[in-house]
Amino acid sequence: MLNRVVVTIDGLEYTVVSEDSPESIRRSANLVDENIAAVKQAAPLSSLSASVLAAMNLAESYYKALESTDNLRRQIKDYAEENGRLRAELNRLKRR
């Protein structure tokens, strides 16, 4: 089911149509709005320039989160492999 949600970003209203929940849509819009406002507060920029810089900041955060997720997946895999080795060793020792 498609949800239609009106959000305000940088003072402009947008109608977003998405299968995501209204709460999720609003949360995303708020994140974008807050990032644009932070960029504008740091430097006097046009809405377009502030939007581009905010998008760059969000993209950087996204890629850092992906990298962190990849690192966690590798750690989990390593722990699972170590767990398997330790279980095998434990079983071997129990058979003695």
Which ranges hold each PLM region?
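DHp/HisKA dimerization-phosphoacceptor four-helix bundle of two-component histidine kinases
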Residues: 20, 78-81
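Heptad-repeat coiled-coil/leucine-zipper oligomerization helices
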Residues: 42-54, 58-61, 65-68, 72-75, ...
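Short, positively charged
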Residues: 2-50, 56
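Short hydrophobic/aromatic patches at helix-to-coil boundaries
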Residues: 2, 93-96
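Structural signal for well-ordered, non-membrane alpha-helices
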Residues: 33, 84-87
